[in-house]
């Protein structure tokens, strides 16, 4: 049984992404704002984090920046896990704005994260997200305490979380083979 500290990345900025031609998956190159960096610096000082064995991060820029700030404070090494990425709003990577991503998230919520029988949408299902998140959790369940830096929607597929604020820590006890949690659509 492992003790995970799930930390959502700090506040990001999506300004100027289109200026660089970044859309779809390219939006995940968004860095933290100055406020986001300050949020993480406060979180990084939380004494609970000192007991962790390592930091495991999503590959997205906002998560990697968050992990780097926490690593600097704790002295822990950072591992990157591709499966720790955020929910995929558009498998075809055609969306260009936050508004379009939010519309896809509303559709995801409307259908409770699963495609109706016979239909396929652009977004990743809760079931798919849960499989990849559990794959990462299972890999690190051998450690006593681990910090995971990632994303709110993805973390909600691993343990019941109503909502996560930027740089918030949610503690989670995890054991391989445990039952799936309820996914919060709030």
Model-derived features: positions:
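Acidic, low-complexity terminal tails and accessory targeting/binding regions
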Residues: 1-3, 79-80, 85-101, 142, ...
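Short, active-site-adjacent cap segments at secondary-structure transitions
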Residues: 13, 63-64, 86-88, 154-156
């Amino acid at each position: 049984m492992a003790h995970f500290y799930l930390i959502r990345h700090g506040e990001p900025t999506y300004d100027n992404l289109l200026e660089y031609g970044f859309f779809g998956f390219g939006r995940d190159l968004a860095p933290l704002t100055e406020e986001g960096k300050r949020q993480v610096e406060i979180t990084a000082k939380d004494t609970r984090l000192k007991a962790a064995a390592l930091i495991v991060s999503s590959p997205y820029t906002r998560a990697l920046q968050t992990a780097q700030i926490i690593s600097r404070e704790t002295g822990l090494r950072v591992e990157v896990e591709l499966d720790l990425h955020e929910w995929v709003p558009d498998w075809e990577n055609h969306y260009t704005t936050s508004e379009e991503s939010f519309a896809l998230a509303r559709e995801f919520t409307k259908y409770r994260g699963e495609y109706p029988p016979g239909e396929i949408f652009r977004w990743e299902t809760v079931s798919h997200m849960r499989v990849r998140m559990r794959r990462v959790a299972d890999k690190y369940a051998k450690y006593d305490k681990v910090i995971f830096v990632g994303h709110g929607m993805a973390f909600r597929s691993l343990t019941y979380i109503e909502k996560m604020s930027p740089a918030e820590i949610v503690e989670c006890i995890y054991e391989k083979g445990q039952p799936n949690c309820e996914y919060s659509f709030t």
